[in-house]
């Protein structure tokens, strides 16, 4: 079983913020396939569905971002999901808007949601899709910046990025060859 995790903060006020881009990608996949996160357990909203012939566990942690691992690790354990079948989608300040970077493994890179997942799983050896949101340029603090909603102009770019990232996830589910998916989907979304 594959496990697709989108990171974000719960609540209406966080919708369409930079920090919630992981939720947006998972929501895009779910909406296009008419799935819903209809279950809750271990601090996570989730569903198990069949997609491209593969059983898939979709998770959105119902903790705040910094505690995401408290939802992800117990659900993966409960459903006996191997860490090699996990993909986490999240915002990345070190990538410009429009950039998507798929990685087989790696550090948290300063992202507190990823730090929590790595700590709870006891490893950083899992796949991730880093979605560029850029850095603040006008002296705004990083916390204020990532919790700020995208502008209308930014949303034009980010809608393409969301769709691109969702297709990358679906491609991995279908093929299980993450190296091929990386070659196809890494880079700038136009």
Swiss-Prot record:
Pfam name, any one: Pept_tRNA_hydro
Gene Ontology BP annotations: protein quality control for misfolded or incompletely synthesized proteins; rescue of stalled ribosome
Location in the cell: Cytoplasm
Annotated residues for binding of tRNA: 14, 64, 66, 112
Domain of life: Bacteria
Keyword Hydrolase: yes
InterPro entries, per the entry: Pept_tRNA_hydro, Pept_tRNA_hydro_CS, Pept_tRNA_hydro_sf
Predominant subcellular localization, coarse grouping: cytoplasm
Entry EC no(s): 3.1.1.29
Site (Stabilizes the basic form of H active site to accept a proton): 91
Catalytic activity: an N-acyl-L-alpha-aminoacyl-tRNA + H2O = an N-acyl-L-amino acid + a tRNA + H(+)
Site residues, Discriminates between blocked and unblocked aminoacyl-tRNA: 9
Keywords: Cytoplasm, Hydrolase, RNA-binding, tRNA-binding
Residues at the catalytic site: 19 (proton acceptor)
GO molecular function, one term: peptidyl-tRNA hydrolase activity
Single GO cellular component term: cytoplasm
SUPFAM superfamilies: Peptidyl-tRNA hydrolase-like
Described function: Hydrolyzes ribosome-free peptidyl-tRNAs (with 1 or more amino acids incorporated), which drop off the ribosome during protein synthesis, or as a result of ribosome stalling.
Family statement drawn from the similarity comment of this UniProt entry: Belongs to the PTH family.
Subunit architecture: Monomer.
Name this protein carries in UniProt: Peptidyl-tRNA hydrolase
